[in-house]
Amino acid sequence: MTMLKLLQRLALGICAGSALAAAGQAQDTQMSIMTGSPTGTYIQIGRDLNNLMQQCGQSLEVVESAGSLENFLGVRQRSNTQFGIVQSDVLEYMQTFASDDPAVARAIAGVRIAFPLYEEEVHILARNDIASFNDLTGKRVAIGVEDSGTFLTASLMLSLAGIEPSETLAIAPGDALPQLQAGDLDAFFYVAGAPATLYSENEIDAEQFHLLPIQNETLEAVYTPATLAGGTYDFQPDPVELVAVKAVLMTYEFDPRGNTYHQASCRGVSDLSSLLLTGIDTLRTDGHAKWQAVDLTDIPPGWDISTCVNRGLDPEYQPNCTQPAPETPQDSEANAVYRRNICAALGC
């Protein structure tokens, strides 16, 4: 499937699903974020944001997904879905095709940036006899499921580099790993912020498999060159040169003066924005390691920040926290008399 056809299918899906978004207006508005697979970085970032919201007495449902394309679709059409994590190359190619294709232009209308996040490394786990990216020619390569950012990135990279595998298989990374280990695949792509749980929590034999270096001038001109530090994974003792793509938190341009669904969603977006700004140090300390690499000023070109996000970042904005303050323990009568006497003598 070509990139244009993939984006057109996305656009048609948005049009077909418009009634679903409208249905959310008649329900109690909840908050949710579209993330990724159970072993990916996106879902851990989503859980960190939910923890942040819970400190304010609110909740953010963390929804598993195929990845970037499904997440973009979810923000546009899924009821009670205010956020989705999306790869910046997905956004870039949507912008490219939007100028020539009205359906794609309609698909991206109303979608906004909430926050830029971090660089995601393109992991390609391969047999050790496959030494370079060019060696994927004629091999059996899994590129992720169709609605994932991994699928789009892998497809673009192979096309840009002129690499033609013997087979490109739409298999999720979590399913591809055992197939690689069984000899049914030669390599598979996985775009995820390191350290990715898939590699850190599974036994991978370094004598059979390695992360493929990606040193290709064409790809390095399109993507960000990156170095995966040695020891990031147990099977990977040495640094690996590869490329990366930025992850971005997307939202929708909810109207704060619109219907009740838009008003409530805008409040939720503003609340999370305010909490993220004031809690970024806590996220960097207690959340996924990728929070330490987040640059909140690195906005992808061609996209605007949501009005509701900017409202939440206003120093005067107060998030709608509903969690009651902890109750002060009540003194017994004897302790109360003691405190009064101490305060009278020493001052309190």
Regions found by a protein language model. Name each.
Residues 28, 40, 57, 67-70, ...:
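Extracytoplasmic
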Residues 20-26:
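Sec/Tat signal peptide C-region and signal peptidase I cleavage site
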Residues 88, 164-265:
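Pocket-lining segment of extracytoplasmic ligand-binding domains
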Residues 103-117, 233-240:
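A structural signal for short loop-to-beta-strand junctions that line the ligand-binding cleft
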Residues 46, 62-104, 176-179, 195-203:
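Pocket-flanking alpha-helical
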Residues 242-348:
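Segments of small-molecule ligand-sensing domains
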Residues 28-54, 60, 120-182:
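Bilobed "Venus flytrap"/periplasmic-binding protein-like clamshell domains
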Residues 1-12:
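Bacterial N-terminal signal peptides that target proteins for export
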